[in-house]
Amino acid sequence: MSAPIAEAVLRYAGLGVAPFHTPGHKGGRGAHPLLRRFLTDEGLAADVSLSAELDDLHAPTGCIRAAEDLAAEAYGADAAYFMVNGTTGAVHTMLMAALSPGDTLLVPRNAHRSIVGAMILAGVRPVYLQPEVDQRLGVAMGVSLETVRRAAEAHPEARAALLVYPTYYGVATELGEIATFLHGRGMLLLTDAAHGAHFAFSDALPPSAMAAGADLSAESTHKLLGSLTQTSMLLARGGRVAAERIRAAAGILQTTSPNELLLASLDLARAQMAEEGRTRLAAVIPLAEELRRRVGEIDGLWTLGAEHMGLPGMAALDATKLTVQVMGLGMTGFAAEGVLRQRDIACELADARNVLLLLSYADGAREIEHLFAALRALAQEHPPRCTARGEGTSFCTLPPLPQTVPSPREAYFAQHECVPIGDAAGRTAAETIVFYPPGIPVLAPGDAIDTETVAYLRTMRRIGARVVGAADATLETLTVIRDL
């Protein structure tokens, strides 16, 4: 299977050319010994930056263009754009290319913090959508077709909808039906498919965003496939957003010195999945489903499965995501995460009720047995406090949708001040406050702060959630727009 970027980089590195160009470590000979240990001599020799010989990410005509074309073919897209600033960069590029300042965007409240940043950059005005909430898990799921329909009819000025597909927990909404509805109104469908880059390579997974009809889709190739961390792709289909706009926006937002190792890893990840992705996913998915069944039989634990799908906003589930509720053990997900780490298991995410564990094409029976043994030991060490599975008293209730008066951009650039959290209700937020993971904003610039949100912030802080984005990480104070 051809990998044009990787082949071009290795070809140049093997020429033995004296490098009187960047980077300064000169093919690795000047690198720190530990860096040489991390990347090896061969890897450092491949860290080159000759756009004249190795193509230019911002105006590709050679190996990068060939690799992007192969990626588009593999994903069923019209075009693919390689991103070295992660899916955050892809999301920013997507909004900058598709929308203009003042445009209205339908966006779920459980969108990633990168979307708030993109709205600030693009000057977009959000209409927030309430996602469906699974009461068993206490977390937001997908946005239903009916919710999108109501919002679009209430806001006929909306130019696009940006949906999370799938959610962090692997839940996919009825995206194909939503695409048909939006396109019928002349609207764009944009997707944050950070956790759906593998969907294109298995019929046992939900349809890919491209197959479902998305116009643009930001996909984290590194999250569940084989490229290096911080590499992603922006996929386009249908021609509703001009290619030159996408390339121009990417040129503004991405570095002019992209690392060839990162680009080559995207190229190789695509080649690997195009050649053997279906076979490897076909091997791990049954293992994941069997693991889910076995864990669900452990007293005190409950797992989200395909049998719980079929509701609005919850059309299908990614089998490679294992959500385990630990409330039956009388503990939070944060506490369970710590216990599992002591058994050499690192979780992807913990929240008030659950831990989330990701499986990928790289996992096999040995890794899965290790995980099962750790979960079984967790339950044995913490006897069940209740017999009900998937039920129980909520640790905290998600706050209601905020009112947004100034746009995120207007709020970001307004005059700010810090106030005690007890005095924040009735003020307008000027910062993004996120509990991470999953990176979903509780407050974003422009949000009206109410008492429910203040209570939620205090509760999440008390139970050990990690705060990101706040000027005061203790949440004793909040940054708000200064009253004039």
Mark where each language-model region is.
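Conserved N-terminal alpha-helix of the aminotransferase class I/II PLP-enzyme fold
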Residues: L44-G89
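Short acidic/polar alpha-helix capping motifs at helix-coil junctions
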Residues: G30-R36, A79-F82, S114, V143, ...
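Charge-dense polyanion-binding interfaces
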Residues: R466-L484
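Conserved C-terminal alpha-helix-loop-beta "cap" of PLP-dependent enzymes
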Residues: E290-A470
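Conserved PLP-enzyme active-site core in the AAT-like
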Residues: I5-L10, G16, A77, T87-E307
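Structural signal for conserved beta-strand scaffold positions within catalytic alpha/beta enzyme cores
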Residues: F82, Y128-Q130, E219, L349, ...
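N-terminal "arm"/small-domain region of PLP-dependent enzymes with the aminotransferase-like
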Residues: M1-T61, P438
